[in-house]
Amino acid sequence: MDATQATRAVVEEMASVMEENRRLLTKLDSEIGDGDHGNNMNRGFKAALERLDTADPSTPADVLKAVSMALISKVGGAAGPLYGTAFLRASTALGDREEISAEDAAEVIEAALGGIKQRGKAEVGDKTIVDALQPAAEAAKEAAGEGNVVGVFRAAAAAAEEGAESTVPLRARKGRASYLGARSEGHQDPGATSTYLLLDAAARTLEGGS
């Protein structure tokens, strides 16, 4: 499997995971938000698969750009622009590369983080996607030195899981959840959770295909 096929396989698994966890994400979002995160992410990744069926991508970046366009056009709320920007920045970071090194993989995650932070103006501790994605990017960068793409995503996913769990006691400072004040405490952030699930899907897919 070449890098383009592998990237597509990752997106297919991400779509499957978003469908499988739709109710979980909806439950988490119902506690502190609009309750639509699960359905929105599921719809967005289904649209991404449809776009890939017609786009015929020739590089990993083409795959990521197609996902970006689908998420921006199909996912409502804050998640669409945020995740759409993340995938677009990841695509730009890869350029026209046909193969992906461990360093490239870490750069992709770092680029996604940069896009989300710029778009959402959030930092660690605000109870958002960033609480999962920033530690993931840091872990990915550290793991890249071992030269193993799977290891990069495995480290990123593990750090993102811890980051998502760390949002439980936090008081939300961004988005709709911030309107709840102290009532947002005691709940895991749905965006941080979906970030972990997406990175875990990538790690498992690449591990299975390596």
Language model segments and positions:
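N-terminal loops that bind phosphate or other acidic moieties
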Residues: 1-210
